[in-house]
Amino acid sequence: MTTGFLQKIFGSRNQRLVKQYQKTVAAINALEPQIEQLTDDQLRGKTGEFRQRVASGESLDKLLPEAFAVCREASKRVLKMRHFDVQLIGGMVLHYGKIGEMRTGEGKTLVATLPVYLNALSGRGVHVVTVNDYLAQRDAEWMARLYNFLGLSVGINLSQMDHAAKQEAYAADITYGTNNEFGFDYLRDNMVYETDARVQRALNFAVVDEVDSILIDEARTPLIISGQAEDHTELYVRMNALPPLLERQIGEEKADGTGVEKPGDYTLDEKGRQVFLTESGHEKAERLLSEWGLIGEGESLYAPQNITLMHHVYAALRAHTLFFKDQHYVVQNGEVVIVDEFTGRLMSGRRWSDGLHQAVEAKEHVKIQSENQTLASITFQNYFRMYAKLSGMTGTADTEAYEFNEIYGLETVVIPTNRPPKRIDKQDQIYKTAKERYDAVIRDIRDCYERGQPVLVGTTSIENSELLSHLLKQAGLPHEVLNAKQHAREAEIVAEAGRPKRITIATNMAGRGTDIVLGGNAEKQASFLELDETLPEDEKRRRIQKLHDEWQALHDQVKAAGGLHIIGTERHESRRIDNQLRGRAGRQGDPGSSRFYLSLEDPLLRIFAGDRVRAIMERLKMPEGEAIEAGIVSRSIESAQRKVEARNFDIRKQLLEYDDVSNDQRKVIYQQRNELLEANDITETIGAMRQSVIADIVHQFVPAGSIEEQWDVPELEEVLRNEWQLDLAIQEMINESNSISADEILEAVEAAADEAYEAKVELVGRESFSAFERSIMLQTLDRSWREHLAALDHLRQGIHLRGYAQKNPKQEYKREAFELFAAMLDAVKLEVTRVVMNVQIQSPEQLEQAAEQLEEQGSHLENVEFRHAEFAEAAAAAPVAAEAATAAMIGDAMSHGSSQAAAANMSADNVPKVGRNDPCPCGSGKKYKQCHGKIV
């Protein structure tokens, strides 16, 4: 109450910010008469002047009024569009690193030109991020005219572009591209073996279009670069026969044994999208798998030799019970293609992880692709937080303002509309069944059609859009369907959606990014005519003129009928998605209306609010076909949506806290890689590693500060001779000396190692040997990092169980992840030193050839995929198996004695049972607890 009272006096934070920006708007407007007097060349020359001032130390903030005034004037001359005052405010919001909420049709693309121009003056690059290639190319080509007029270069970063084209795109002052491509380029840049193979510059400033879609909806889907793993095709096919033989249990068993309405073999958690076998389900699955010869008779699924089968059992169950055709995926050209649950678009090239995609392929009887193994990954949360300055714009951000601030440190500012909105949002209507709901939707559509009012109907899945299309055909109502299956015609369908009597069905926000103009989009229709090569030029001009003449009459007709009417056939889990659908109507002060039609069979109502609403309907004795239309019900639904949003936010926050651990380690590894790539000579680095490794070996047998009786000199001599090619008579040194310390022995071994190293360098030359060392170092670091990623994933999968031991799983994860990381770095030092010390060199040419083969092996990975993965599933992506050394001499180096071969094959999964103080089975000579036991 006090807060509301104070807000009335002082205004909200949003109102105060807008008021503050309006003062700067007045300063920009005051400059307009002066800027208008400039010739085109003088206006263009302002860019050079601004750049000099920035180089001299003037801040971009101080330059803002002049730069915005110049950009606005250039837009008037080139694009024939003048920025409104509210668009100037939007530009300031973006420049100051905030998120701007702008209603649909308020000109977000034009707003972005202001901060993009201003920040490009620094010469450090600006990235404009969009959700798909079509929008990136459209906006870049449209706005390039403005930027080029002002003397700035524009690049487009698209998927499938070659390396040279990408480097050129990133070198431009302004780079347009998709969130996926920017993220993948970052990962690829950290897998290269030459500095000139990188494409990105330092991440300076990004303007993210549809920021809610990218930073929130896709925050749970990390970008993953992966290769193909072992083929389990036959196993997926055989497991596909299991789910149909199992029955679902209805109800959860309570502590007193009640609660189960119908016993079964598995239970479903629809909220968490998980499936769990019951006790009887385990027994039945084990019996069936035993009959099929997949496990031994009487064996448990949890026996060590069968534990991987559980992964296949659950993948098959999830594929059959939680993922459905034309809702979560479509089958197209013999492939299973994922449908984005937020946008309804097909996500070609993306695959679910953890074997789920292969299980769905087995279910649909299409060709099963191989499983994937992770080479590199990053979340959008951690990628975009690396920019020095980040901003974004969307039509619906205010509902997620807390998350933007909490996760990204971004403040949300609601930007006023240029004209007051006239859209009427009607009360939801709730029916008992889906059939009653669809009958009401058809009645509303028919009413609009007869009055000449265009209708946009939003559905939550392809399946529902096709069901509604079938019902409209039966009702004799002509319509267009806009879903992932009609992706190619999307722009054309949206351009026509505002014409009189036009009925358009769209899945969620398909067509987002393109305005629905009342009367139809004459400009868009004209552009289609321009592309028609069969028409003569005279005929084109005549038709385009006719289009413009007809448009005004159609526009007035639609306005008189009430503007665009939005019908929602189901509430989404997020209020923001519902608001996006509503936001398609009432653009730039046009009239419009919206209404949602719901049924108690909808997932959101059934899971979260069904019982309460059903009780209200039964109390009111609602007859069939009658709807509830009351504020209390709408509030109940909104409350359910808030619960889901809060739950999803908690999930994203938890995932980020876990991912931050691997992100900190990723930064260290990538920094080390970059230092290796950029260093002219890594002799000092290799020398420090060699000293560290030699010290560890000597201290195993001759501990520091110990007496001679505690030394194991014969074993030390043997290890140095067999594993490190150092033939030292240490026992003779001891016998000849009256008193020799452990430190003196260490110095003698280090001197011998340095001498052997220098002899190899002298044979081939410092430059050649340094190049070889760099290749070995990069290859080992990359391989170890991939294995470490898999180790972290396995750790994360079981870490929640620590809660049962009264331990904090997050703290335990951080502690153990750090220990794994330290062990990995030690393993890298050991491996690199071992190869360098053991390598047999005959000639410089042989060394160069080996280095080239190593680099080629690391940079040309076969069957590489660039994809998203559902985060919970991404954790199960397997590591890349250790690559075999490519050069013969490295093969020789790695085969000196059995211990090297054994060590190369030691991992947490195949270490035999051994006492902590026993010698490690890898043959290193260390105690198990100080060697591979440390990693396990």
Swiss-Prot record:
Q: Where does ATP bind?
A: 87, 105-109, 515
Q: How does it sit in the membrane?
A: Peripheral membrane protein
Q: Which residues bind Zn(2+)?
A: 920, 922, 931-932
Q: Name one Pfam family in it.
A: SecA_DEAD
* Keyword Disulfide bond part of the UniProt annotation: no
Q: Which family does it belong to?
A: Belongs to the SecA family.
What is the documented function of this protein? Part of the Sec protein translocase complex. Interacts with the SecYEG preprotein conducting channel. Has a central role in coupling the hydrolysis of ATP to the transfer of proteins into and across the cell membrane, serving both as a receptor for the preprotein-SecB complex and as an ATP-driven molecular motor driving the stepwise translocation of polypeptide chains across the membrane.
| Assembly with partners or alone | Monomer and homodimer. Part of the essential Sec protein translocation apparatus which comprises SecA, SecYEG and auxiliary proteins SecDF-YajC and YidC.
By what name is this protein known? Protein translocase subunit SecA
State the organism named in the record: Paraburkholderia xenovorans (strain LB400)
Name of the gene this protein is made from: secA
